[in-house]
Amino acid sequence: MAEELIVIAKRDCPTCTMLEDVYATLASGPVPVRIYSQDDPTFPESVSDVIDDTTLEASFRHNIEIVPTLIRLTDGAEMGRTFGWHRGDWESLSGLGELGEDLPESQPGCGAKNVEPGIRERLEVQFGDVGFASRTIELGGYDDPLESCFERGWTDGLPVVPPTDERILRMLKGTSRDPKELVGRIPPNYGECTVEKVAINAVMAGCKPEYMPVVLAALEASLIPEFAMHGLLCTTYFSGPTIIVNGPVTRAIGMNSGVNALGQGNRANSTIGRALQLIIRNVGGGKPNEIDRSTLGNPGKVSFCFAEDESDANWMPLSVARGFEAGTSTVTLFHGDGVQAFCDQKSRTPEELARSMAMALNGVGHPKLAQWSNAILVISPEHYRIFDDAGWGRAEIEEAIHTASVRPGKDLVQGAQGVGEGIDPALVDESLPKFWRDHGLLIVRAGGDAGLFSAIIGGWIGGRNREVVQPVTYAIR
């Protein structure tokens, strides 16, 4: 049987440099030895035939994490390894006695260069079996990657992170799913989207790898037929996908449900929503002035994603209200138009505040339209406190707002009050609530502690087709 020893070390490590005499003893011993240096081919100086591993290929292939590492091979198969310095382990593995008698009995090693941040992914791309399926675009030496992304139409108007192989590989480590798995066909052009393509766009959006499960869930939710993504992309209305995230994942990845929850400044909120929009654009072909014919659009079509505040034990989270068990991480996708301010600094009872909110909600789309579009009501902590102090929870708030939003059809029909817009004249004798009771109004909690201000996010007028256009809630896996 062929026996062999391998040593991998680096000069920039006190433990490695301490073992100069040990390397010389191994090199003169009966078992052949290969000594690799990660950072300096002239080290160790006590050995004449050091192997240059500054490319780190050998370190990568031997999966080195700590240097120095000593490995014993028999017929090319690894029989054992030790790392750092421990005299007994080195003597046992090498078969030599009295190694490093003047040295301490043991000393910890140092981190290997091949596992330094950013290096591992580069080595996997260079020497591993990565095999990306997506087409690679080679840039010239003087090409600016940021400008190249703009020129190829891959951006939403803001700079994107160039999707290098290393960044894509790092992003894929955020999920256990096969990169080649088909997630779905993305409207409007129905391009095939794999997990790998999701990772590419997540890189471009600025996501961290730990956001990948949320991005994947949001994408899968958007492809559920009831969400009607194709229609949403083709409408001339304002709407785009709005993502509400619930459950433990919001805390795990640092999402914002507090101060400025609907605004800028939080990486997870901003980039998860942006990743979905980039996938729609780059894989599905949903680009403005092409299939996207929105008259005005809204700023949320760059990104609109936030977490619900679940810190109050008395409050039923949106995910639970929509049928999921407490503690389940979910995404809810809604056809959102943008934020409409609701200011009420005078109401002091829950009944009064609910009526006030209903008045504001009646303006969604148009004050004379009913059961025409859906909405989200984001209740701020100060407004919620008025409800909570009176013992009101989700059920009581929803019931009071729906009841207060009911209006006589004679005031809403086309032509009433001197305004042509309105509901079907056949409904003149009906009394109609503003929203469908089952999914027309989604109520969530979010926002900073100060301010008697809540928010209304109006919805797509396609919501009038209640059987085929609905918000959807989907579990994150």
Question: What are these model-derived regions, one by one?
Answer:
Residues A2-E3, G29, S37-D39, L70, ...:
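Catalytic cores of nucleotide-enabled group-transfer and carboxylate-activating enzymes in metabolic
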Residues I8-D12, Y36-D39, S380-E382, A446:
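Structural motif
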Residues P30-T55:
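Thiol-based oxidoreductase modules, predominantly thioredoxin-like and allied folds used
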Residues R61-N63:
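Short loop/turn motifs at secondary-structure junctions and domain boundaries
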Residues G100-A133, G140:
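Iron-sulfur (Fe-S) cluster-binding modules
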Residues E124-R477:
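Non-transmembrane, aqueous-exposed alpha-helical and coiled segments at domain scale
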